Amino acid sequence: MRKTTLFRQLIDSPEILLLPGIHDVLSARIGSGAGFKAMTGGGFSASATLLGRPDTSQLSLTEMVNHYERICEVIDVPFFGDGDTGFGNVTNVSRTVRMYERAGLAGMFIEDQVFPKRCGHMVGKNVIPAEEMVSKLKAALDARQDPDFVIMARTDANAVNGFEDALDRMALYHEVGADLLFV
């Protein structure tokens, strides 16, 4: 079974799915050995591991793809990755999805921050207009070759514009077809 199909089955299951956040191939092997059914990795952990720096869009798409591909090569379970803002505009999002799929990921999340972005835990974040994010999500959904490749929409609007805006955005992102939502 493809890792994408397995991941979709895991998220559709009524059971809670625990995804350890791993940061490199060693932690991926440890997570796999511990019996986790799937794993995830974030931009902050990738930036810290590869550069020793915070997650402020300093890693390129190619660097993230190479990092995630190495992780996917050493585990037999699905891996869900951080797609940041899609590394730019709508055109960039399409390319990001295609490259993440080819690298072996089971899915990714895309966030609605401006590019270059700041880590979600940092102050000074800004979000793009919701309509622009809807266009990015449509591009991401259209770009995926495997219908089981999971696309999660993430918003940082709660910290920027308040909870109501975050909820409004989630409703829009769900309507356009995002598989998962993250506030």
Where are these regions (language model features)?
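Alpha/beta enzyme core
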Residues: R2-V183
